[in-house]
């Protein structure tokens, strides 16, 4: 997953 603002549309926690 990608859990920081820079992930943009890929943001996931």
Curated annotation (Swiss-Prot):
Tissue spec: Expressed by the venom duct.
**Classification via InterPro entries:** Conotoxin_a-typ_CS
Q: Please name every pair of cysteines joined by a disulfide bond in this record.
A: 2-7, 3-13
Q: Where does this chain mainly localize?
A: secreted
A single GO molecular function term of this UniProt record: toxin activity
One Gene Ontology cellular component annotation? extracellular region
User: Where is the protein localized?
Assistant: Secreted
Per UniProt, the keywords (alphabetical) are: Acetylcholine receptor inhibiting toxin, Amidation, Disulfide bond, Neurotoxin, Postsynaptic neurotoxin, Secreted, Toxin
The entry sums up its family as follows: Belongs to the conotoxin A superfamily.
Domain remarks: The cysteine framework is I (CC-C-C). Alpha3/5 pattern.
Q: In UniProt terms, what function does this protein have?
A: Alpha-conotoxins act on postsynaptic membranes, they bind to the nicotinic acetylcholine receptors (nAChR) and thus inhibit them. This toxin inhibits fetal and adult muscle-type nAChR (IC(50)=52.1 nM towards alpha-1-beta-1-gamma-delta/CHRNA1-CHRNB1-CHRNG-CHRND, and IC(50)=102.8 nM towards alpha-1-beta-1-delta-epsilon/CHRNA1-CHRNB1-CHRND-CHRNE). Shows potent activity on the synthetic AChR alpha-1-beta-1-delta/CHRNA1-CHRNB1-CHRND (IC(50)=16.9 nM).
Any remaining note in the record? Five analogs with residue replacement and/or modifications (hydroxylation or bromination) have been synthesized. Four of them show decrease in both ability to inhibit acetylcholine receptors, and lethality towards fish.
Q: What is this protein called?
A: Alpha-conotoxin OI
Q: What species is this protein from?
A: Conus obscurus (Obscure cone)
């Amino acid at each position: 997953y990608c859990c920081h603002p820079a992930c943009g549309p890929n943001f996931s926690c």
